[in-house]
């Protein structure tokens, strides 16, 4: 179970096996053993140390976000599946080509997801055929890519067509991580939630989040998390496109109402199939860790 807390002044405490959240929306109670993640999306939230301890004992994760949706920190148990051997396998894969093959797979899944989004929007796209053809060509180019640069070139070619289509659907000015319009702010916010889920699973799988296979390593940049999350970005894109006309921004940031609405919609999408995405992410991370040490 994922719990979103986005009300300024909300209080979180634990009592008799329950997590209690009190705020503007009233009082909510959740069995602690059913809680997987608690997402704190705004400032002014207080959580007791008793609640924090109870959540950690239950194996839950508490993630704190800034106003842009960027995860600022994650409270979780010391990693139980971390071994030096797994990280050594990961470091070897980063240089012997196996890591690049994983990165290609994740980029392929992202581009395929982008193409699926276009198919859903085809009746609203005047240039659907042109966009779809460009993305299909990028998929073919990716299949023969042998270097990180070639992978990124294929990814960029698909992105050019995809975001042009997205502009036609949403009316936003174009994809810009620093964009101050509601759609770009919404994409950043949704990706932040996805990033937190991926970061948690990478750590629990015993891998190093800061050593990736495609994104360049840089101090403080969780390169593996950024590589790993690529495959699920289109699901966030679809939610933001659906809410594009509802989202509002002030000074380049989503309003409180929009943050709450988007977070609820993103988590609803992540749990819509009956197989929660957080569980899928966790399984995939463990599968990768196992494969790196057996291949």
UniProtKB/Swiss-Prot annotation:
Function: CRISPR (clustered regularly interspaced short palindromic repeat), is an adaptive immune system that provides protection against mobile genetic elements (viruses, transposable elements and conjugative plasmids). CRISPR clusters contain spacers, sequences complementary to antecedent mobile elements, and target invading nucleic acids. CRISPR clusters are transcribed and processed into CRISPR RNA (crRNA). Acts as a dsDNA endonuclease. Involved in the integration of spacer DNA into the CRISPR cassette.
GO biological-process terms attached to the record: CRISPR-cas system; defense response to virus; maintenance of CRISPR repeat elements
A GO term, aspect molecular function: DNA binding
Family: Belongs to the CRISPR-associated endonuclease Cas1 family.
Positions bound to Mn(2+): 155, 215, 230
Identification of the protein by name: CRISPR-associated endonuclease Cas1 2
Keywords: Antiviral defense, DNA-binding, Endonuclease, Hydrolase, Magnesium, Manganese, Metal-binding, Nuclease
Pfam families membership: Cas_Cas1
Keyword Magnesium: yes
Domain of life: Archaea
Disulfide bonds: none
CDD domains: Cas1_I-II-III
Cofactor or coenzyme needed: Mg(2+); Mn(2+)
EC main group: hydrolase
Lineage, top ranks: Archaea, Thermoproteota, Thermoprotei, Thermoproteales, Thermoproteaceae
Oligomeric form and interacting partners: Homodimer, forms a heterotetramer with a Cas2 homodimer.
Protein's organism: Pyrobaculum aerophilum (strain ATCC 51768 / DSM 7523 / JCM 9630 / CIP 104966 / NBRC 100827 / IM2)
EC id: 3.1.-.-
